[in-house]
UniProtKB/Swiss-Prot annotation:
<comment type="similarity">
    <text>Belongs to the UPF0329 family.</text>
</comment>
<feature type="region of interest" description="Disordered">
    <location>
        <begin position="313"/>
        <end position="407"/>
    </location>
</feature>
<feature type="compositionally biased region" description="Acidic residues">
    <location>
        <begin position="370"/>
        <end position="384"/>
    </location>
</feature>
<dbReference type="InterPro" id="IPR011667">
    <property type="entry name" value="UPF0329"/>
</dbReference>
<dbReference type="Pfam" id="PF07753">
    <property type="entry name" value="DUF1609"/>
</dbReference>
<feature type="compositionally biased region" description="Basic residues">
    <location>
        <begin position="346"/>
        <end position="356"/>
    </location>
</feature>
<protein>
    <recommendedName>
        <fullName>UPF0329 protein ECU02_0060</fullName>
    </recommendedName>
</protein>
<feature type="compositionally biased region" description="Basic and acidic residues">
    <location>
        <begin position="357"/>
        <end position="369"/>
    </location>
</feature>
<dbReference type="Pfam" id="PF12376">
    <property type="entry name" value="DUF3654"/>
</dbReference>
<dbReference type="InterPro" id="IPR022115">
    <property type="entry name" value="DUF3654"/>
</dbReference>
<feature type="compositionally biased region" description="Basic and acidic residues">
    <location>
        <begin position="313"/>
        <end position="345"/>
    </location>
</feature>
Amino acid sequence: MGMWLVWIFALDNILCASKEEEKKCELPRRLGEMNIKEITEKVEIDGLDTKIIIPFIFHDAKPVVSPITRYRDISQEERRYVEEIIKGLPKLVWDSMVWIYVPGYTWWIKSLMDNVFNATSFEGFNPVDLYKKAKGKSEIRFADLVMSIFRFNGRIVNRFGQRLVREVEVKIKEMSNEMPSSEKKEKEERLNQILEYGKKLCTREKQEEMLKAQKIVCDACVYLWEKGSEDRVAITIMVYLRNLEVQMIRSSMKKVKVGEPLTFYMNHEVLISAYKEYKIGVAGELVKQVLKNDKDIDSESVNRVVCSIREREEDERKRAEAESARNREELLRMEEREKGKEKGSKGKGRKKRGKKGAGEAKEESKEEDRGGEEEESVEADVPVEEMAVGGARPKKKSPKEESKGEERCYKVHKRVLRWMKSAERIKYELDNGEEEKWRGRSIEEIEEQKALHDIIEVLKLLRSKECDKFFVRTGKYMKGGSERWNMVGVGILEEGGKKRVGNVEVGLFEGKGGENIIYHLMFKPTDFEEEGEGARPSFGRCDGVDAIEEGRISDMSGFQYPPGVRSEITSSGSEFRIVWKNQRDTSLVLRSLTVLRIPEIR
Protein backbone atom coordinates (compact mmCIF):
# COMPACT_ATOMS: atom_id res chain seq x y z
CA MET A 1 0.00 0.00 0.00
CA GLY A 2 3.01 2.29 0.20
CA MET A 3 2.78 3.21 -3.49
CA TRP A 4 -0.84 4.27 -3.03
CA LEU A 5 0.38 6.60 -0.29
CA VAL A 6 2.74 8.15 -2.83
CA TRP A 7 -0.13 8.69 -5.25
CA ILE A 8 -2.20 10.33 -2.52
CA PHE A 9 0.63 12.58 -1.31
CA ALA A 10 1.49 13.55 -4.89
CA LEU A 11 -2.15 14.35 -5.61
CA ASP A 12 -2.80 16.39 -2.45
CA ASN A 13 -4.32 19.31 -4.27
CA ILE A 14 -6.63 17.07 -6.29
CA LEU A 15 -7.74 14.67 -3.59
CA CYS A 16 -8.39 17.52 -1.17
CA ALA A 17 -10.65 19.29 -3.65
CA SER A 18 -13.91 20.36 -2.05
CA LYS A 19 -15.99 19.15 -4.97
CA GLU A 20 -16.06 15.52 -6.03
CA GLU A 21 -16.70 16.65 -9.62
CA GLU A 22 -13.41 18.57 -9.70
CA LYS A 23 -11.53 15.49 -8.51
CA LYS A 24 -13.10 13.23 -11.11
CA CYS A 25 -12.25 15.68 -13.90
CA GLU A 26 -8.69 16.33 -12.75
CA LEU A 27 -7.57 12.77 -11.96
CA PRO A 28 -7.89 11.37 -15.50
CA ARG A 29 -6.05 14.38 -16.92
CA ARG A 30 -3.12 13.91 -14.54
CA LEU A 31 -2.97 10.11 -14.49
CA GLY A 32 -3.57 9.32 -18.14
CA GLU A 33 -4.41 5.62 -18.45
CA MET A 34 -4.25 4.83 -14.72
CA ASN A 35 -7.28 2.97 -13.44
CA ILE A 36 -9.09 5.78 -11.61
CA LYS A 37 -11.65 3.46 -10.07
CA GLU A 38 -8.87 1.32 -8.59
CA ILE A 39 -7.17 4.35 -7.02
CA THR A 40 -10.35 5.73 -5.48
CA GLU A 41 -11.26 2.31 -4.09
CA LYS A 42 -7.79 2.03 -2.55
CA VAL A 43 -7.85 5.43 -0.88
CA GLU A 44 -11.35 4.74 0.43
CA ILE A 45 -10.03 1.90 2.59
CA ASP A 46 -6.48 3.05 3.31
CA GLY A 47 -7.25 6.08 5.41
CA LEU A 48 -6.81 5.07 9.05
CA ASP A 49 -4.13 2.38 8.86
CA THR A 50 -0.82 2.67 10.67
CA LYS A 51 2.38 3.55 8.85
CA ILE A 52 6.15 3.14 9.18
CA ILE A 53 9.24 4.66 7.55
CA ILE A 54 12.10 2.68 5.98
CA PRO A 55 15.43 4.33 7.02
CA PHE A 56 17.20 4.65 3.65
CA ILE A 57 18.11 7.62 1.47
CA PHE A 58 18.71 7.04 -2.24
CA HIS A 59 20.24 9.39 -4.76
CA ASP A 60 19.61 8.19 -8.30
CA ALA A 61 20.52 4.48 -8.26
CA LYS A 62 22.71 4.59 -5.19
CA PRO A 63 21.89 4.16 -1.48
CA VAL A 64 23.78 7.14 -0.07
CA VAL A 65 22.47 6.55 3.46
CA SER A 66 21.74 3.13 4.96
CA PRO A 67 20.29 2.41 8.43
CA ILE A 68 23.78 2.23 9.95
CA THR A 69 25.32 5.21 8.11
CA ARG A 70 26.89 7.91 10.26
CA TYR A 71 27.43 11.40 8.94
CA ARG A 72 31.18 10.92 8.52
CA ASP A 73 30.46 7.89 6.30
CA ILE A 74 28.64 10.00 3.70
CA SER A 75 30.78 11.05 0.74
CA GLN A 76 31.53 14.77 0.43
CA GLU A 77 29.65 15.14 -2.86
CA GLU A 78 26.46 13.66 -1.36
CA ARG A 79 26.37 15.55 1.94
CA ARG A 80 24.45 18.60 0.74
CA TYR A 81 21.82 16.36 -0.88
CA VAL A 82 21.47 14.28 2.30
CA GLU A 83 21.18 17.39 4.48
CA GLU A 84 18.31 18.68 2.32
CA ILE A 85 16.48 15.38 2.73
CA ILE A 86 17.05 15.38 6.51
CA LYS A 87 15.67 18.92 6.81
CA GLY A 88 12.36 17.61 5.54
CA LEU A 89 12.31 14.50 7.74
CA PRO A 90 10.38 16.00 10.71
CA LYS A 91 7.46 16.86 8.39
CA LEU A 92 7.65 13.48 6.60
CA VAL A 93 7.66 11.67 9.95
CA TRP A 94 4.75 13.81 11.19
CA ASP A 95 2.67 12.96 8.12
CA SER A 96 3.43 9.26 8.54
CA MET A 97 2.38 9.37 12.20
CA VAL A 98 -1.01 11.10 11.95
CA TRP A 99 -1.98 11.70 8.31
CA ILE A 100 -5.33 10.21 7.25
CA TYR A 101 -7.36 10.36 4.08
CA VAL A 102 -11.12 10.48 4.45
CA PRO A 103 -13.12 11.45 1.34
CA GLY A 104 -14.71 14.86 1.75
CA TYR A 105 -12.72 15.77 4.88
CA THR A 106 -9.09 15.54 3.86
CA TRP A 107 -8.53 19.25 3.31
CA TRP A 108 -9.39 20.42 6.82
CA ILE A 109 -7.58 17.43 8.41
CA LYS A 110 -4.44 18.23 6.40
CA SER A 111 -4.79 21.89 7.32
CA LEU A 112 -5.13 20.98 11.01
CA MET A 113 -2.06 18.74 10.81
CA ASP A 114 -0.01 21.54 9.29
CA ASN A 115 -1.26 24.08 11.84
CA VAL A 116 -0.31 21.88 14.80
CA PHE A 117 3.07 21.04 13.29
CA ASN A 118 3.94 24.62 12.32
CA ALA A 119 2.91 25.91 15.75
CA THR A 120 5.39 23.56 17.41
CA SER A 121 8.66 25.05 18.54
CA PHE A 122 11.67 23.18 17.17
CA GLU A 123 14.09 25.30 19.16
CA GLY A 124 16.95 23.13 20.33
CA PHE A 125 16.09 20.34 17.90
CA ASN A 126 17.80 20.51 14.52
CA PRO A 127 18.04 17.04 12.93
CA VAL A 128 20.87 18.06 10.58
CA ASP A 129 22.97 19.41 13.46
CA LEU A 130 22.12 16.36 15.56
CA TYR A 131 23.34 14.08 12.78
CA LYS A 132 26.44 16.15 11.95
CA LYS A 133 27.79 17.32 15.28
CA ALA A 134 27.72 14.15 17.35
CA LYS A 135 31.26 12.92 17.95
CA GLY A 136 32.89 9.74 19.17
CA LYS A 137 30.60 7.41 21.09
CA SER A 138 27.68 9.82 20.73
CA GLU A 139 27.88 9.72 16.91
CA ILE A 140 24.51 8.41 15.77
CA ARG A 141 23.42 6.18 12.90
CA PHE A 142 20.69 7.22 10.49
CA ALA A 143 18.24 4.76 12.08
CA ASP A 144 18.90 6.46 15.44
CA LEU A 145 18.25 9.87 13.87
CA VAL A 146 14.90 8.70 12.49
CA MET A 147 13.90 7.46 15.94
CA SER A 148 14.95 10.77 17.53
CA ILE A 149 12.62 12.60 15.14
CA PHE A 150 9.77 10.18 15.91
CA ARG A 151 10.22 10.75 19.65
CA PHE A 152 10.27 14.53 19.20
CA ASN A 153 7.12 14.48 17.08
CA GLY A 154 5.51 12.13 19.58
CA ARG A 155 5.18 15.07 21.98
CA ILE A 156 2.60 16.75 19.74
CA VAL A 157 0.50 13.71 18.77
CA ASN A 158 -1.70 14.23 21.82
CA ARG A 159 -2.20 17.90 20.95
CA PHE A 160 -3.26 17.00 17.41
CA GLY A 161 -5.61 14.27 18.68
CA GLN A 162 -7.37 16.73 21.01
CA ARG A 163 -7.79 19.33 18.26
CA LEU A 164 -9.08 16.67 15.88
CA VAL A 165 -11.70 15.45 18.39
CA ARG A 166 -12.94 19.00 19.08
CA GLU A 167 -13.32 19.90 15.43
CA VAL A 168 -15.07 16.64 14.55
CA GLU A 169 -17.57 17.16 17.39
CA VAL A 170 -18.30 20.65 16.06
CA LYS A 171 -18.83 19.31 12.54
CA ILE A 172 -21.24 16.64 13.80
CA LYS A 173 -23.31 19.27 15.65
CA GLU A 174 -23.35 21.56 12.62
CA MET A 175 -24.72 18.91 10.26
CA SER A 176 -27.97 20.13 8.69
CA ASN A 177 -31.19 18.28 9.40
CA GLU A 178 -32.31 19.19 5.90
CA MET A 179 -29.63 16.94 4.44
CA PRO A 180 -30.94 13.72 2.79
CA SER A 181 -30.87 10.87 5.31
CA SER A 182 -28.56 8.63 3.24
CA GLU A 183 -26.01 11.41 2.78
CA LYS A 184 -26.24 12.40 6.45
CA LYS A 185 -25.71 8.80 7.55
CA GLU A 186 -22.63 8.44 5.34
CA LYS A 187 -21.09 11.66 6.66
CA GLU A 188 -21.83 10.71 10.27
CA GLU A 189 -20.09 7.35 9.78
CA ARG A 190 -16.99 9.01 8.37
CA LEU A 191 -16.90 11.68 11.07
CA ASN A 192 -17.32 9.05 13.79
CA GLN A 193 -14.38 7.14 12.30
CA ILE A 194 -12.26 10.27 12.52
CA LEU A 195 -13.55 10.93 16.05
CA GLU A 196 -12.50 7.48 17.27
CA TYR A 197 -9.12 7.88 15.58
CA GLY A 198 -8.57 11.24 17.27
CA LYS A 199 -9.43 9.77 20.68
CA LYS A 200 -6.93 6.95 20.13
CA LEU A 201 -4.20 9.46 19.34
CA CYS A 202 -4.76 11.00 22.77
CA THR A 203 -3.94 7.76 24.59
CA ARG A 204 -0.47 6.88 25.83
CA GLU A 205 -0.93 3.32 24.51
CA LYS A 206 -1.35 4.56 20.92
CA GLN A 207 1.56 6.97 21.18
CA GLU A 208 3.86 4.28 22.58
CA GLU A 209 2.66 1.82 19.94
CA MET A 210 3.80 4.18 17.16
CA LEU A 211 7.27 4.51 18.66
CA LYS A 212 7.63 0.79 19.39
CA ALA A 213 6.62 -0.20 15.87
CA GLN A 214 9.02 2.26 14.24
CA LYS A 215 11.84 1.19 16.57
CA ILE A 216 11.29 -2.45 15.54
CA VAL A 217 11.38 -1.44 11.86
CA CYS A 218 14.63 0.51 12.34
CA ASP A 219 16.20 -2.36 14.31
CA ALA A 220 15.02 -4.85 11.67
CA CYS A 221 16.61 -2.81 8.88
CA VAL A 222 19.87 -2.60 10.84
CA TYR A 223 19.67 -6.36 11.45
CA LEU A 224 19.16 -7.12 7.75
CA TRP A 225 21.97 -4.76 6.76
CA GLU A 226 24.45 -6.32 9.17
CA LYS A 227 23.26 -9.93 8.95
CA GLY A 228 25.05 -10.80 5.70
CA SER A 229 25.63 -9.77 2.12
CA GLU A 230 22.55 -11.57 0.74
CA ASP A 231 20.12 -9.80 3.09
CA ARG A 232 21.90 -6.49 2.54
CA VAL A 233 21.58 -6.85 -1.22
CA ALA A 234 17.96 -8.00 -0.92
CA ILE A 235 16.71 -5.05 1.12
CA THR A 236 18.72 -2.58 -0.98
CA ILE A 237 17.23 -3.83 -4.24
CA MET A 238 13.72 -3.88 -2.76
CA VAL A 239 14.05 -0.26 -1.60
CA TYR A 240 15.60 0.68 -4.97
CA LEU A 241 12.62 -0.81 -6.82
CA ARG A 242 10.17 1.16 -4.70
CA ASN A 243 12.21 4.33 -5.24
CA LEU A 244 11.99 3.77 -9.00
CA GLU A 245 8.21 3.54 -8.66
CA VAL A 246 8.11 6.75 -6.64
CA GLN A 247 10.28 8.44 -9.26
CA MET A 248 7.92 7.39 -12.07
CA ILE A 249 4.83 8.51 -10.12
CA ARG A 250 6.25 11.86 -9.11
CA SER A 251 7.68 12.61 -12.55
CA SER A 252 4.19 12.05 -13.99
CA MET A 253 2.89 14.51 -11.38
CA LYS A 254 5.74 16.96 -12.11
CA LYS A 255 7.07 16.54 -8.58
CA VAL A 256 10.76 15.76 -8.93
CA LYS A 257 11.97 15.45 -5.34
CA VAL A 258 12.87 11.79 -4.87
CA GLY A 259 15.15 10.12 -2.38
CA GLU A 260 13.65 10.59 1.07
CA PRO A 261 12.80 7.50 3.13
CA LEU A 262 9.76 5.57 1.95
CA THR A 263 6.51 5.31 3.91
CA PHE A 264 4.53 2.05 4.05
CA TYR A 265 1.45 0.73 5.80
CA MET A 266 2.38 -1.85 8.44
CA ASN A 267 0.03 -3.01 11.17
CA HIS A 268 1.66 -1.88 14.43
CA GLU A 269 -0.10 -4.38 16.69
CA VAL A 270 0.80 -7.37 14.50
CA LEU A 271 4.42 -6.24 14.17
CA ILE A 272 4.90 -5.67 17.91
CA SER A 273 3.25 -9.00 18.77
CA ALA A 274 5.41 -10.87 16.24
CA TYR A 275 8.55 -9.23 17.59
CA LYS A 276 7.69 -10.17 21.18
CA GLU A 277 7.11 -13.81 20.24
CA TYR A 278 9.71 -14.42 17.52
CA LYS A 279 12.27 -11.60 17.92
CA ILE A 280 14.19 -9.65 15.28
CA GLY A 281 14.58 -12.38 12.64
CA VAL A 282 10.86 -12.59 11.94
CA ALA A 283 10.49 -8.80 12.16
CA GLY A 284 13.18 -8.46 9.49
CA GLU A 285 11.37 -10.88 7.18
CA LEU A 286 8.10 -9.01 7.71
CA VAL A 287 9.78 -5.75 6.68
CA LYS A 288 11.12 -7.47 3.56
CA GLN A 289 7.65 -8.81 2.81
CA VAL A 290 6.10 -5.33 3.03
CA LEU A 291 8.80 -3.96 0.73
CA LYS A 292 8.45 -6.82 -1.72
CA ASN A 293 4.66 -7.07 -1.91
CA ASP A 294 3.63 -3.51 -0.93
CA LYS A 295 0.92 -5.01 1.28
CA ASP A 296 0.11 -4.69 4.97
CA ILE A 297 0.77 -7.60 7.32
CA ASP A 298 -1.60 -9.72 9.40
CA SER A 299 -1.40 -12.83 11.59
CA GLU A 300 -1.32 -15.05 8.50
CA SER A 301 1.67 -13.09 7.20
CA VAL A 302 3.50 -13.81 10.43
CA ASN A 303 2.69 -17.53 10.27
CA ARG A 304 3.92 -17.75 6.68
CA VAL A 305 7.16 -15.99 7.55
CA VAL A 306 7.78 -18.23 10.57
CA CYS A 307 7.18 -21.36 8.46
CA SER A 308 9.41 -19.99 5.70
CA ILE A 309 12.27 -19.35 8.13
CA ARG A 310 11.96 -22.85 9.61
CA GLU A 311 11.94 -24.40 6.14
CA ARG A 312 14.99 -22.38 5.17
CA GLU A 313 16.85 -23.40 8.33
CA GLU A 314 15.97 -27.06 7.69
CA ASP A 315 17.08 -26.66 4.08
CA GLU A 316 20.41 -25.19 5.19
CA ARG A 317 20.88 -28.03 7.69
CA LYS A 318 20.30 -30.65 4.99
CA ARG A 319 22.66 -28.88 2.60
CA ALA A 320 25.35 -28.73 5.29
CA GLU A 321 24.91 -32.45 6.03
CA ALA A 322 25.09 -33.31 2.32
CA GLU A 323 28.22 -31.20 1.91
CA SER A 324 29.80 -32.87 4.95
CA ALA A 325 28.96 -36.32 3.54
CA ARG A 326 30.54 -35.41 0.18
CA ASN A 327 33.68 -34.22 1.93
CA ARG A 328 33.92 -37.46 3.94
CA GLU A 329 33.52 -39.54 0.78
CA GLU A 330 36.21 -37.55 -0.97
CA LEU A 331 38.60 -38.06 1.97
CA LEU A 332 37.95 -41.82 1.90
CA ARG A 333 38.64 -41.95 -1.84
CA MET A 334 41.89 -40.06 -1.36
CA GLU A 335 42.95 -42.44 1.44
CA GLU A 336 42.15 -45.48 -0.71
CA ARG A 337 44.18 -44.07 -3.60
CA GLU A 338 47.15 -43.49 -1.28
CA LYS A 339 46.90 -47.03 0.12
CA GLY A 340 46.76 -48.43 -3.42
CA LYS A 341 49.92 -46.59 -4.38
CA GLU A 342 51.75 -47.88 -1.28
CA LYS A 343 50.79 -51.54 -1.96
CA GLY A 344 51.87 -51.25 -5.58
CA SER A 345 55.31 -49.94 -4.65
CA LYS A 346 56.16 -52.66 -2.02
CA GLY A 347 56.19 -55.70 -4.37
CA LYS A 348 58.46 -54.17 -7.02
CA GLY A 349 62.25 -54.02 -7.37
CA ARG A 350 63.88 -50.66 -6.98
CA LYS A 351 64.85 -50.31 -10.64
CA LYS A 352 61.55 -51.59 -11.89
CA ARG A 353 59.79 -49.52 -9.31
CA GLY A 354 61.61 -46.49 -10.63
CA LYS A 355 60.60 -47.29 -14.18
CA LYS A 356 57.08 -48.07 -13.15
CA GLY A 357 56.99 -44.87 -11.17
CA ALA A 358 57.97 -42.97 -14.27
CA GLY A 359 55.36 -44.90 -16.21
CA GLU A 360 52.76 -44.13 -13.57
CA ALA A 361 53.70 -40.48 -13.73
CA LYS A 362 53.27 -40.53 -17.49
CA GLU A 363 49.98 -42.40 -17.16
CA GLU A 364 48.73 -39.89 -14.57
CA SER A 365 49.80 -37.07 -16.84
CA LYS A 366 47.84 -38.61 -19.71
CA GLU A 367 44.80 -39.04 -17.49
CA GLU A 368 45.01 -35.40 -16.45
CA ASP A 369 45.27 -34.37 -20.10
CA ARG A 370 42.23 -36.47 -20.97
CA GLY A 371 40.36 -34.96 -18.03
CA GLY A 372 41.15 -31.48 -19.30
CA GLU A 373 39.94 -32.40 -22.79
CA GLU A 374 36.72 -33.79 -21.35
CA GLU A 375 36.13 -30.60 -19.38
CA GLU A 376 36.74 -28.48 -22.46
CA SER A 377 34.41 -30.58 -24.59
CA VAL A 378 31.64 -30.27 -21.99
CA GLU A 379 32.29 -26.56 -21.71
CA ALA A 380 32.12 -26.18 -25.47
CA ASP A 381 28.75 -27.94 -25.52
CA VAL A 382 27.17 -25.78 -22.85
CA PRO A 383 27.24 -22.19 -24.19
CA VAL A 384 23.95 -20.72 -25.33
CA GLU A 385 24.00 -19.07 -28.75
CA GLU A 386 23.64 -15.31 -28.49
CA MET A 387 20.23 -13.93 -29.31
CA ALA A 388 21.53 -11.72 -32.10
CA VAL A 389 19.28 -9.46 -34.15
CA GLY A 390 17.94 -11.11 -37.28
CA GLY A 391 19.13 -14.55 -36.21
CA ALA A 392 22.84 -13.95 -36.81
CA ARG A 393 25.06 -16.58 -35.22
CA PRO A 394 28.10 -15.56 -33.13
CA LYS A 395 31.61 -16.49 -34.09
CA LYS A 396 32.73 -19.85 -32.68
CA LYS A 397 35.09 -19.43 -29.73
CA SER A 398 38.10 -21.56 -29.00
CA PRO A 399 37.96 -23.95 -26.01
CA LYS A 400 40.38 -21.73 -24.09
CA GLU A 401 38.25 -18.65 -24.65
CA GLU A 402 35.16 -20.53 -23.54
CA SER A 403 36.82 -21.90 -20.42
CA LYS A 404 37.50 -18.32 -19.31
CA GLY A 405 33.78 -17.61 -19.34
CA GLU A 406 32.78 -20.76 -17.49
CA GLU A 407 30.22 -19.01 -15.28
CA ARG A 408 28.63 -17.34 -18.31
CA CYS A 409 27.59 -20.59 -20.02
CA TYR A 410 24.10 -21.96 -19.60
CA LYS A 411 21.69 -24.52 -20.92
CA VAL A 412 18.05 -23.53 -21.15
CA HIS A 413 15.08 -25.61 -20.02
CA LYS A 414 12.24 -25.98 -22.51
CA ARG A 415 9.79 -24.47 -20.04
CA VAL A 416 11.66 -21.20 -20.68
CA LEU A 417 11.79 -21.61 -24.47
CA ARG A 418 8.06 -22.33 -24.80
CA TRP A 419 7.23 -18.65 -24.18
CA MET A 420 8.75 -17.78 -27.56
CA LYS A 421 5.90 -19.60 -29.33
CA SER A 422 2.47 -18.28 -30.24
CA ALA A 423 -0.09 -17.83 -27.45
CA GLU A 424 -2.23 -20.61 -28.94
CA ARG A 425 0.67 -23.06 -29.00
CA ILE A 426 1.71 -22.09 -25.47
CA LYS A 427 -1.83 -22.67 -24.21
CA TYR A 428 -1.92 -26.12 -25.81
CA GLU A 429 1.39 -27.11 -24.17
CA LEU A 430 0.39 -25.71 -20.77
CA ASP A 431 -3.02 -27.39 -20.78
CA ASN A 432 -1.34 -30.72 -21.53
CA GLY A 433 1.68 -30.14 -19.32
CA GLU A 434 2.59 -31.26 -15.82
CA GLU A 435 2.37 -27.87 -14.06
CA GLU A 436 -1.16 -27.72 -12.72
CA LYS A 437 -1.15 -23.99 -11.97
CA TRP A 438 -0.82 -23.21 -15.70
CA ARG A 439 -3.70 -25.36 -16.92
CA GLY A 440 -6.93 -23.79 -18.11
CA ARG A 441 -5.54 -20.30 -18.65
CA SER A 442 -7.28 -18.14 -21.24
CA ILE A 443 -5.52 -16.82 -24.34
CA GLU A 444 -5.66 -13.33 -22.81
CA GLU A 445 -3.87 -14.56 -19.66
CA ILE A 446 -1.30 -16.40 -21.79
CA GLU A 447 -0.58 -13.25 -23.80
CA GLU A 448 -0.09 -11.26 -20.58
CA GLN A 449 2.30 -13.90 -19.25
CA LYS A 450 4.12 -14.12 -22.58
CA ALA A 451 4.97 -10.42 -22.35
CA LEU A 452 6.63 -11.12 -18.98
CA HIS A 453 8.31 -14.47 -19.82
CA ASP A 454 9.37 -14.08 -23.46
CA ILE A 455 12.64 -12.28 -22.69
CA ILE A 456 15.22 -14.83 -23.88
CA GLU A 457 17.42 -11.96 -25.14
CA VAL A 458 18.42 -11.39 -21.51
CA LEU A 459 20.74 -14.39 -21.95
CA LYS A 460 23.08 -12.17 -23.92
CA LEU A 461 23.55 -10.05 -20.80
CA LEU A 462 23.86 -13.11 -18.56
CA ARG A 463 26.74 -14.41 -20.69
CA SER A 464 28.58 -11.09 -20.81
CA LYS A 465 31.37 -9.86 -18.57
CA GLU A 466 29.01 -7.11 -17.37
CA CYS A 467 26.58 -9.63 -15.86
CA ASP A 468 27.59 -9.08 -12.24
CA LYS A 469 26.92 -5.35 -12.56
CA PHE A 470 23.29 -6.06 -13.45
CA PHE A 471 22.44 -9.20 -11.46
CA VAL A 472 22.98 -10.45 -7.92
CA ARG A 473 23.22 -14.14 -7.05
CA THR A 474 21.21 -15.51 -4.16
CA GLY A 475 22.16 -18.38 -1.88
CA LYS A 476 21.49 -21.98 -2.88
CA TYR A 477 18.50 -23.90 -1.58
CA MET A 478 16.82 -27.28 -2.11
CA LYS A 479 13.50 -27.64 -3.94
CA GLY A 480 11.93 -30.65 -5.65
CA GLY A 481 15.04 -32.75 -5.15
CA SER A 482 17.39 -30.29 -6.87
CA GLU A 483 19.77 -27.65 -5.59
CA ARG A 484 18.77 -24.26 -6.95
CA TRP A 485 19.86 -20.66 -6.89
CA ASN A 486 18.75 -17.45 -8.55
CA MET A 487 20.00 -14.30 -10.18
CA VAL A 488 17.96 -11.14 -9.70
CA GLY A 489 18.13 -7.85 -11.57
CA VAL A 490 16.07 -4.66 -11.74
CA GLY A 491 14.19 -3.61 -14.85
CA ILE A 492 11.48 -1.47 -16.42
CA LEU A 493 9.06 -3.04 -18.90
CA GLU A 494 7.22 -0.68 -21.22
CA GLU A 495 4.25 -1.85 -23.27
CA GLY A 496 1.32 0.07 -24.69
CA GLY A 497 2.52 3.33 -23.15
CA LYS A 498 2.57 1.86 -19.63
CA LYS A 499 5.78 1.44 -17.64
CA ARG A 500 6.14 -1.21 -14.94
CA VAL A 501 9.04 -1.55 -12.51
CA GLY A 502 10.11 -4.99 -11.34
CA ASN A 503 12.69 -7.72 -10.95
CA VAL A 504 14.29 -9.69 -13.75
CA GLU A 505 14.34 -13.21 -12.29
CA VAL A 506 16.59 -16.04 -13.43
CA GLY A 507 16.13 -19.44 -11.77
CA LEU A 508 18.92 -22.01 -12.15
CA PHE A 509 19.84 -25.50 -11.04
CA GLU A 510 22.87 -27.71 -11.58
CA GLY A 511 22.43 -30.56 -14.04
CA LYS A 512 23.83 -34.05 -13.57
CA GLY A 513 26.76 -33.12 -15.77
CA GLY A 514 27.55 -30.07 -13.65
CA GLU A 515 26.16 -27.57 -16.16
CA ASN A 516 24.06 -24.57 -15.14
CA ILE A 517 20.48 -24.89 -16.40
CA ILE A 518 18.04 -21.98 -16.57
CA TYR A 519 14.54 -23.21 -15.74
CA HIS A 520 12.90 -19.84 -14.99
CA LEU A 521 13.27 -16.51 -16.78
CA MET A 522 10.80 -13.72 -16.15
CA PHE A 523 10.26 -10.03 -15.63
CA LYS A 524 8.18 -9.84 -12.43
CA PRO A 525 6.56 -6.41 -11.88
CA THR A 526 6.24 -5.10 -8.35
CA ASP A 527 2.46 -5.22 -8.77
CA PHE A 528 2.53 -8.86 -9.92
CA GLU A 529 -0.04 -11.11 -8.26
CA GLU A 530 0.11 -14.90 -8.11
CA GLU A 531 -1.25 -17.68 -5.95
CA GLY A 532 0.78 -18.23 -2.82
CA GLU A 533 2.80 -15.06 -3.27
CA GLY A 534 2.54 -14.24 0.43
CA ALA A 535 3.98 -17.62 1.26
CA ARG A 536 7.30 -16.74 -0.32
CA PRO A 537 8.79 -13.72 1.43
CA SER A 538 12.34 -14.83 0.56
CA PHE A 539 14.15 -12.58 -1.89
CA GLY A 540 14.60 -13.92 -5.41
CA ARG A 541 13.31 -17.46 -4.92
CA CYS A 542 11.48 -18.94 -7.92
CA ASP A 543 9.68 -21.67 -5.97
CA GLY A 544 6.66 -21.97 -8.23
CA VAL A 545 8.27 -24.98 -9.92
CA ASP A 546 8.55 -28.26 -8.06
CA ALA A 547 10.37 -31.18 -9.68
CA ILE A 548 12.17 -30.37 -12.96
CA GLU A 549 12.79 -32.90 -15.72
CA GLU A 550 16.44 -32.42 -16.55
CA GLY A 551 16.03 -34.11 -19.91
CA ARG A 552 13.91 -31.26 -21.18
CA ILE A 553 16.78 -28.83 -21.78
CA SER A 554 18.56 -27.32 -24.75
CA ASP A 555 21.89 -25.64 -25.34
CA MET A 556 20.14 -23.61 -28.09
CA SER A 557 22.50 -25.01 -30.75
CA GLY A 558 21.14 -24.37 -34.22
CA PHE A 559 18.48 -21.95 -33.02
CA GLN A 560 17.55 -19.20 -35.47
CA TYR A 561 14.95 -16.48 -35.14
CA PRO A 562 12.29 -16.27 -37.83
CA PRO A 563 13.19 -14.06 -40.81
CA GLY A 564 13.09 -10.37 -40.04
CA VAL A 565 13.97 -8.40 -36.95
CA ARG A 566 12.62 -9.63 -33.62
CA SER A 567 14.46 -7.22 -31.38
CA GLU A 568 17.19 -4.65 -31.07
CA ILE A 569 19.65 -4.72 -28.19
CA THR A 570 21.69 -1.79 -26.93
CA SER A 571 23.94 -1.70 -23.91
CA SER A 572 25.70 0.96 -21.88
CA GLY A 573 27.40 1.03 -18.52
CA SER A 574 24.14 1.77 -16.72
CA GLU A 575 21.50 -0.15 -18.69
CA PHE A 576 20.87 -3.07 -21.05
CA ARG A 577 17.90 -2.40 -23.31
CA ILE A 578 15.87 -4.79 -25.46
CA VAL A 579 13.29 -3.41 -27.90
CA TRP A 580 10.90 -5.87 -29.53
CA LYS A 581 9.46 -4.76 -32.86
CA ASN A 582 6.79 -5.85 -35.27
CA GLN A 583 8.60 -8.12 -37.74
CA ARG A 584 6.42 -6.93 -40.62
CA ASP A 585 6.85 -3.26 -39.77
CA THR A 586 9.95 -2.61 -37.68
CA SER A 587 8.90 1.00 -37.08
CA LEU A 588 6.28 -0.36 -34.67
CA VAL A 589 7.62 -1.07 -31.18
CA LEU A 590 5.74 -3.83 -29.36
CA ARG A 591 7.44 -3.56 -25.98
CA SER A 592 10.81 -2.88 -24.40
CA LEU A 593 12.71 -4.09 -21.37
CA THR A 594 15.45 -2.03 -19.75
CA VAL A 595 17.63 -3.91 -17.27
CA LEU A 596 19.24 -1.39 -14.92
CA ARG A 597 22.57 -1.61 -13.21
CA ILE A 598 22.10 -2.73 -9.60
CA PRO A 599 22.84 -0.20 -6.85
CA GLU A 600 26.37 0.07 -5.52
CA ILE A 601 26.39 -1.49 -2.07
CA ARG A 602 29.26 -0.77 0.29
